């Protein structure tokens, strides 16, 4: 019996430690592109699902923090104005910190409840609960400038007379060779001349 217990103990010690919820918790990187004067968060639904939060609640927070208007269209989030991937990623991180992560055990196993009209974050892992803060809207400056050497996710809106695909980012027309209308691509801007920009494909993302 002692040999059995010793063998069992050795086996348990040799087993790798199970990964906790925190280690499994991964937030998708925001995938954005521009349509006219709007910013489209193409994987909005996937992000809300990963956070285990109501998409409407997440969207309301993002609109307030970005200081803009917008809506949910299917799996996408659409925002008025031009916002960088980093700007949106920063606000998602702020949402996670306030509405997802437990302040005691630092795990994401939480849910939102209302107690006496106060919105609370309750942790399923450790049982802790806390009120969430009422946040004031912050003015976030939307960027509409593209830069040489930078890579952007673009939606090809038309094809020029020479066969190059054309994407629009605010006042800029970006020419991307070997692309077709409706295609979404990642392209690196090689040259900017006035409001015209010339880019080359880095990756094809598919059709819109």
Swiss-Prot record:
GO molecular function: translation initiation factor activity
Keywords of this entry: Initiation factor, Protein biosynthesis
Keyword Protein biosynthesis tagged: yes
Domain (TRAM) ranges: 145-203
Tree of life domain: Archaea
Classification via Gene3D superfamilies: 3.30.30.170, Nucleic acid-binding proteins
Family: Belongs to the eIF-2-beta/eIF-5 family.
Function: eIF-2 functions in the early steps of protein synthesis by forming a ternary complex with GTP and initiator tRNA.
HAMAP family linked to this entry: eIF_2_beta
Subunit record text: Heterotrimer composed of an alpha, a beta and a gamma chain.
Protein name, UniProt field: Translation initiation factor 2 subunit beta
């Amino acid at each position: 019996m002692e040999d059995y217990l010793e063998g069992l103990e050795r086996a348990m010690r040799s087993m790798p430690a199970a990964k906790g919820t925190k280690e499994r918790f991964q937030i998708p990187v925001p995938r954005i592109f521009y349509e006219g004067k709007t910013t489209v968060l193409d994987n909005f639904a996937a992000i809300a699902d990963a956070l285990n939060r109501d998409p409407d609640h997440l969207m309301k927070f993002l609109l307030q923090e970005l200081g803009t208007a917008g809506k949910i269209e299917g799996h996408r989030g659409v925002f008025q104005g031009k916002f960088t991937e980093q700007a949106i990623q920063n606000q998602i991180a702020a949402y996670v910190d306030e509405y997802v992560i437990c302040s005691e055990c630092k795990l994401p196993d939480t849910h939102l409840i209302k107690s006496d009209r106060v919105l609370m974050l309750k942790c399923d892992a450790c049982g802790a609960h806390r009120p969430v803060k009422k946040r004031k809207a912050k003015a976030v400056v939307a960027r509409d400038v593209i830069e040489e050497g930078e890579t952007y996710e673009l939606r090809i809106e038309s094809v020029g007379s020479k066969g190059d695909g054309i994407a629009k980012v605010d006042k800029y027309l970006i020419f991307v060779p070997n692309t077709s209308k409706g295609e979404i691509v990642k392209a690196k801007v090689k040259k900017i001349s006035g409001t015209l920009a010339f880019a080359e494909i880095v990756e094809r993302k598919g059709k819109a």
